[in-house]
Swiss-Prot record:
GO terms for molecular function: adenyl-nucleotide exchange factor activity; protein homodimerization activity; protein-folding chaperone binding; unfolded protein binding. PROSITE patterns: GRPE. It is found in: Cytoplasm. Participates actively in the response to hyperosmotic and heat shock by preventing the aggregation of stress-denatured proteins, in association with DnaK and GrpE. It is the nucleotide exchange factor for DnaK and may function as a thermosensor. Unfolded proteins bind initially to DnaJ; upon interaction with the DnaJ-bound protein, DnaK hydrolyzes its bound ATP, resulting in the formation of a stable complex. GrpE releases ADP from DnaK; ATP binding to DnaK triggers the release of the substrate protein, thus completing the reaction cycle. Homodimer. Disulfide bonds: none annotated. Belongs to the GrpE family. This is Protein GrpE. The keyword ATP-binding does not apply. Keywords: Chaperone, Cytoplasm, Stress response.
């Protein structure tokens, strides 16, 4: 009402002029905020990126699994390669001994002893250990009792080894065949 025109209008009985309130239009809102469609497109792009990353990670996991299985398969296939190479020298020595036309018992025996040393060396290099438990306490994990005999030794002591056993590292390859003392 401080405006003189408004004062005149009020005196004349005219209604005062109200200044219209300008509301922002939808176009003005879209200028400042991204539209729903734009937000939706942005979220779709993010979802597609995440899906693509998931597919890549899944494929990489499958590739790693396949390569690991291939490596395991090759390890099984060629695990004995080193040991087999060591045994070839033993085979060669045996063939050479058989090829000699005139042998004496002494030369034959020394050849067999050398071949046995080669075999023992191959066993040692490949962690193949002999189990010869004579005089030891019977161990059912490493020994196989064939029978029990009367003995002056303590009960459950290995008296006789009928066949040596063998272990690879800590695993029994073949248990020793033994006779065990009954006790006093």
């Amino acid at each position: 009402m401080s405006n003189p025109e408004n004062a005149q209008d009020a005196m004349l009985g005219n209604e005062p002029a109200v200044e219209p309130v300008v509301e922002p239009t939808a176009e003005q809102h879209t200028d400042t905020l991204p539209s729903i469609e734009e937000q939706f497109r942005a979220l779709e792009l993010k979802a597609a990126e995440h899906y693509d990353a998931w597919l890549r990670a899944k494929a990489e996991g499958e590739n790693i699994r396949r390569r690991a299985q291939d490596d395991i398969s090759k390890a099984h296939k060629f695990a004995v390669e080193k040991f087999a190479g060591e045994l070839l020298a033993v085979k060669d020595s045996l063939e050479a001994a058989l090829a000699v036309q005139e042998q004496t018992v002494d030369s034959f025996k020394s050849g067999v002893e050398l071949t046995l040393k080669q075999l023992v060396s191959a066993f040692d290099k490949n962690a193949l250990n002999e189990v010869n438990p004579a005089g030891e306490k019977f161990d059912p994990h490493k020994h196989q009792a064939i029978g029990m005999v009367d003995s002056e030794q303590e009960a459950n002591t290995v008296v006789t080894v009928l066949q040596k056993g063998y272990m690879i590292a800590d695993r029994v390859l073949r248990p020793a065949l033994v006779m065990v003392a009954k006790g006093k």
